[in-house]
Regions:
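Glycine-rich beta-strand-centered segment in the early N-terminal region that forms part
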Residues: 10-27, 39-82
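NAD(P)H dinucleotide-binding glycine-rich loop of Rossmann-like/cofactor-binding domains
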Residues: 34, 76-137, 184
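Short glycine-centered segments of the SAM/dcSAM-binding site in methyltransferase folds
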Residues: 73, 132, 156, 225-226, ...
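Mid-domain Rossmann-like dinucleotide-binding core that forms the NAD(H)/NADP(H) cofactor-binding site
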Residues: 113-183
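Adenosine-nucleotide cofactor-binding segment
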Residues: 151-213, 266-270
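Glycine-rich phosphate-binding loop and adjacent beta-alpha segment
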Residues: 161, 170, 212-284, 316-318
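C-terminal capping/lid region of NAD(P)-dependent oxidoreductase domains
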Residues: 277, 281-287, 298-318
């Protein structure tokens, strides 16, 4: 991360479809770390800004903007532009009204994680009440969101992670059971999943981890189950022995929340409306384990790389 530094930039007035926002907080996400290493699928031209998303207050809007007005509290996406900043100008399509019951720090940690969980479990996984949901990487941001949404949808939620201590927090988020996946440098959880599901295996598996975790997941999935591919935090993209899908009748489903909205614009709008509604009804509670100042943004990414977080890490802008 030797190339990461704070610089001064000139912010222009918003164009006709743009919104100028005073940033109050920005979330630190795993893709931010990958982008500093040149490993993320989206590779903006150098130099680029870090911080995929944030929350703030609208200062002014372009002439054709009708979605928000000056003074509104909003969340926004900023991939490539960089939310680790005091002011930002973004297209109105990247902006949503902030859930009224969240702080700016919570709101900065909200949109990407909970939208990913919603598209995964509702749109792609079609999770039903009473089904069993296995959430890998449950102590991270997208895992936290999946645990809370799974509980809201009426599933039996099994949370997994590498740290027994950190997994305790997932019980507060709604997990019914927890499983430590890594013991003595060995991955093993499928027998515990089978025990917790009456020998059947999980109906839906939410996997932002990949690697060995995926390899073991295909051996504890129920007949007709759905494995949702959310990411590869382990660093290894696994391969699928296709005969396993034939024998066990399961589906492997890729999830890209942003692309889903681009391909299905109306449902994309509905997705954002639904996660905001559920949040304002009190069912979502983004957990922020640590905040950094804007001057400490580089340290926030280092903290993420050390796998210390529970829930989300946020950069606060004052």
């Amino acid at each position: 991360m030797s190339g990461v530094e704070l610089v001064e930039n000139q912010i222009n007035e918003p164009k006709e479809n743009e919104i100028l926002i005073k940033v109050k907080a920005a979330s630190v996400n795993f893709p931010d770390l990958l982008m500093t290493q040149g490993k993320y699928q989206h590779k903006p031209d150098l130099p680029f800004g870090l911080g995929m998303e944030g929350a703030g207050i609208v200062l002014s809007v372009g002439s054709k903007v009708s979605k928000v007005k000056e003074g509104d509290e909003v969340t926004f996406g900023a991939l490539g532009k960089g939310a680790f900043t005091e002011l930002i100008c973004v297209n109105e399509n990247s902006v949503e009204i902030k859930p009224s019951n969240l702080t700016f720090e919570q709101a900065a940690a909200f949109q990407t994680a909970y939208l990913t969980a919603y598209v995964s479990l509702v749109r792609r996984g079609e999770l039903k009440k009473g089904e069993s949901l296995l959430v890998h990487g449950a102590t991270g941001g997208v895992g936290m969101a999946a645990v809370q949404l799974g509980k809201y949808l009426g599933a039996k939620v099994i949370a997994t992670g590498t740290s027994k201590e950190k997994l305790k927090e997932t019980i507060n988020w709604g997990a019914d059971h927890t499983i430590q996946t890594h013991k003595e440098n060995k991955v093993e959880f499928r027998n515990e999943v089978k025990e917790l599901t009456g020998g059947l295996g999980a109906d839906v598996i939410y996997d932002p981890v990949g690697g060995d975790v995926f390899d073991h997941s295909i051996r504890c999935i129920n007949w007709g189950g759905r494995i949702l591919i959310v990411g590869f935090a382990s660093g290894r993209i696994p391969t699928l022995p296709i005969n396993m899908a034939l024998i066990k009748g399961f589906s492997v489903v890729g999830v890209r929340a942003g692309e889903f909205a681009r391909k299905n614009p109306e449902k994309g709008v509905e997705n954002n409306q639904e996660i905001r509604r559920i949040c304002e009804e009190g069912f979502f509670d983004p957990y922020v384990c640590k905040t950094f100042l804007l001057s400490e943004a580089k340290e926030s990414i280092k903290y993420l790389s050390e796998r210390k977080l529970i829930g989300k890490v946020v950069v606060k802008v004052d």
